[in-house]
Amino acid sequence: MKPDILLEICCGSAEDAIEAARGGADRVELNNNLFQGGLTPSIGTLEVVKAEIDIPVMAMVRPRAGGFCYTETELATARADAKALIRKGADGLVFGFLHADGTVDTERTRAFVELAEGRPCVFHRALDVVPDWKRALDELISAGVTRVLTSGQQSNVFFALETIREMIAFAGNAIEILPGAGITLENVDRVVRETGCSQVHLARHRILTDTSVANNREIYYGGCLYPPEDRIEITDREYVSAVRSRLGGSER
């Protein structure tokens, strides 16, 4: 395994990001609500993370769950969030904008690249639903996007290794390809070997218990799935460290 494979960890809280950095992550993607694919983190979360870790923090800008064709109100929210995140020290932005037909909204994409003020910009897995990924990559390159996060238009990277390899070859040095979704300690070697990627994106959590809700097990604060309210997910530092070792490098 090459020692220069960059490890990015997908994080849903300040605790996640701190544990990821301690485990040896090279970069974190900071979100809120990973259950819904990751939404915009709070400014307070970003401030705490920036005060505690010294690796790049890419901040998600996603005002709601679901698709990526936003109303003007949602776009205004995303714009305000992006400006605040940059002002508070985000090292880059992660976003995705599509038209109703699933093609890249280049105008909105370019506008958010400008909001980043020269910092790296990532077009996230919205790429995985575009009808023509080659055309989409060309448009993202033209818009000034630094990197794309992709599962190769499959539910799991492992089912799209050849496509991701094709994406990397097509992109050349014009835009970075970051594989993510379904990468594990057990398959990361093969993902790197068969795609030729130089970086990987993954998440892994362990479960903590919050006993403050133990007095009444009939109460739920979320929607219809009714998850146990005493369970908290946090980045598994030891797992991150194991992946870092597998890729080459050591725990921080």
Summary of predicted features, one role per range:
Residues 15, 34-55, 73-75, 97-117, ...:
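Active-site-adjacent beta->alpha loops and helix N-cap segments on the catalytic face
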Residues 1-10, 50-51, 216, 252:
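N-terminal amphipathic alpha-helix/helix-capping segment at the start of soluble metabolic enzymes
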Residues 47-86, 96:
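Structural motif corresponding to the early beta-alpha repeats
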Residues 12-22, 69-81, 128-143, 167, ...:
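Catalytic cores of alpha/beta
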Residues 5-11, 28-30, 57-61, 93-95, ...:
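Hydrophobic faces of well-ordered beta-strands that scaffold small-molecule active sites
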Residues 2-28, 33-40:
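N-terminal pre-domain/capping segments
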Residues 65, 172-252:
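C-terminal alpha-helical cap/extension of soluble enzyme domains
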Residues 22-28, 53-56, 89-92, 115-119, ...:
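Glycine-enriched alpha-helix->loop->beta-strand junction motifs that scaffold or abut catalytic
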